[in-house]
Amino acid sequence: MTNKIEHFGWLVSPYSAKTRAYLKYKQIPFNDVEPNIFHFYTKIQKAVGRIIMPTLKLPDGSWLQDSSHIIDEMELKYPSRSITPEGNNQVLVSLLFELYADEWLPMAALHYRWNIKAN
């Protein structure tokens, strides 16, 4: 068992980039694992029931999936350098930004990636 968090995520995944940036900002030691077919079926799917990115394996052997859930859980475990604003209004705006970025920006990214010939 490793004493570092294992971060399973693709380099091209915006959600994996979100959790990777979060872990770096919080200065939480982790191993960044770009998963392969072996990881999918022998680790990730067995642990969480499906193949999904990003996924974290914690040092205690537990697993977390979904970028927002990962960040919420990690904020509880590592409260220093919090990403949560102090005021209620700022919290609301922060959550709205997260909702927009998680649900709407990937559609724009896919559009620009696949509908512009130069890309």
Q: Which residues fall in each region the model found?
A:
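GST-like domain detector, emphasizing the conserved glutathione-binding G-site
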Residues: M1-N119
